[in-house]
């Protein structure tokens, strides 16, 4: 049963690839735009220039079970990104259930493998992977955004059926929320994913994730992650802390 309870968490790593590679910001402002122009601008940003310099993030992971407090655990991981296609990690600290560290290692192993295999193209928010529909203009954390509906073109666990918040000024993705297009197991009724993004030292990164799985028989389980710290290549190699990534935007 423990294997069943943790299997869904691999999805979180695959979905996280949507934003695991930061993009250099282009904050060009646009006037009133048509729906197609919004999607065009979003796609241009998705395919924008990737960071050339290596960087490191410190992530905090929390695993919890709504009906099972013994599943609760807390893990801190150090993740190194080396463009164009290299990722490695180290677990810094782990407490609570040993299941937490096992799950986080599976998540990060999947991320490392997907990075080296170039699989991130299959999760990009573009017309190759999704059909879009315009919902309206909204404000998210004080930022004006276009809210678009997402309908995956394929039934794959790496794609999300839901909504995307696109920054009205930069056309970068600020948030994605929805259910995975396909669950990898009969044991999983559904998996809901929420991803958040923000600027860290001029690079647009996925800063948080919440994945909630409705597991048959044993009930819901939740995995969350957030960036605690971001370090440039020079700072990471010296071991000096540069800044916290969970500041208010």
Regions found by a protein language model. Give the residues of each.
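A short pocket-lining beta-strand/turn micro-motif at the edge of beta-sheets
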Residues: 193, 200-207
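Hydrophobic h-region of N-terminal signal peptides that target proteins for export
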Residues: 14-24
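Composition- and surface-driven signal marking solvent-exposed, interaction-prone regions
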Residues: 14, 161-163, 177-179
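Structured extracytoplasmic
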Residues: 25-161, 168-172, 181-191, 203, ...
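Bacterial N-terminal signal peptides that target proteins for export
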Residues: 1-13
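Beta-strand-dense domains in secreted/periplasmic systems and polymorphic toxin scaffolds
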Residues: 176, 207-209
């Amino acid at each position: 049963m423990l294997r069943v309870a943790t299997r869904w968490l691999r999805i979180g790593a695959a979905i996280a690839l949507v934003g695991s590679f930061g993009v250099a910001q282009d904050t060009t402002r646009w006037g009133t735009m048509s729906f197609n122009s919004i999607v065009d601008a979003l796609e241009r940003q998705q395919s924008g220039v990737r960071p050339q310099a290596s960087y490191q993030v410190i992530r905090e992971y929390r695993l919890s079970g709504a009906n099972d407090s013994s599943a609760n655990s807390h893990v801190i991981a150090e993740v190194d990104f080396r463009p164009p296609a290299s990722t490695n990690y180290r677990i810094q600290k782990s407490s609570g259930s040993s299941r937490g560290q096992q799950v986080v290692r599976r998540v990060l192993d999947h991320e490392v493998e997907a990075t080296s295999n170039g699989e991130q193209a299959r999760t990009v928010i573009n017309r190759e992977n999704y059909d879009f529909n315009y919902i309206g203009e909204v404000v998210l954390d004080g930022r004006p955004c276009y809210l678009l509906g997402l309908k995956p073109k394929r039934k794959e666990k790496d794609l999300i059926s839901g909504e995307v918040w696109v920054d009205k000024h930069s056309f970068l993705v600020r948030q994605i929320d929805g259910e995975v297009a396909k669950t990898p197991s009969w044991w999983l009724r559904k998996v809901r994913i929420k991803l958040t993004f923000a600027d860290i030292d001029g690079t647009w990164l996925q800063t948080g994730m919440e994945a909630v799985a409705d597991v048959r028989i044993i009930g819901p389980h939740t995995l969350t992650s957030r960036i605690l710290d971001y370090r440039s290549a020079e700072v990471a190699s010296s071991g000096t802390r540069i800044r916290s990534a969970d500041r208010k935007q």
